[in-house]
Curated annotation (Swiss-Prot):
Biased composition (Polar residues): 32-45
Domain of life the protein comes from: Bacteria
Organism, as annotated: Nitratiruptor sp. (strain SB155-2)
Its job: Binds to the 23S rRNA.
GO biological process: translation
Protein name, UniProt field: Large ribosomal subunit protein uL15
Classification via InterPro entries: Ribosomal_uL15, Ribosomal_uL15/eL18_sf, Ribosomal_uL15_bac-type
GO CC, one annotated term: cytosolic large ribosomal subunit
Length: 133
């Protein structure tokens, strides 16, 4: 076996039928297009998705999808997580040390009724709090 004598298995390939090459071929004259009409003319092609006047699938289905790229802050209730309120300086690192945050969380919002008491301790721009103006 060598590259120069490789050939497909017998019967696996067929010669393509050449249409419009004389009446003796059985596919001459109209070349399998039938008589007259738009589909028999040269240059004819339907646009993609055309279903013969029926409402196309892409118009029948509802429009979906929009995902905001704005990263929403992870909310931490200070009343429930007392350790956050006891920190001397509140930064992302100190919050991570006392509260288990997922790695993807980059912004935090402190909520709860006792937030106003610890506002002066916040030293990070990525930390906001409820009632902020």
């Amino acid at each position: 076996m060598a590259l120069h004598n490789l050939q497909p298995a017998p019967g696996s390939t067929h010669k393509t039928k050449r249409v419009g090459r004389g009446q003796g071929s059985g596919m001459g004259k109209t070349a399998t297009r039938g008589q007259k009409g738009q589909k028999s003319r040269t240059g004819y092609s339907q646009k993609r998705g055309f279903e013969g006047g029926q409402q196309p699938l892409q118009r029948r289905l509802p429009k979906i999808g929009f995902t905001s790229n704005v990263v929403k802050p992870h909310a931490i209730n200070v009343d429930k997580v007392k350790k956050v309120a006891q920190l001397e300086e509140i930064t992302m690192e100190t919050i991570r040390s006392v509260y288990k945050l997922p790695k993807y969380v980059t912004r935090v919002k402190l909520i709860g009724s006792s937030v106003q008491e610890i506002v002066s301790k916040i030293k990070d721009d990525n930390i906001s709090y409820s009632g902020q103006k």
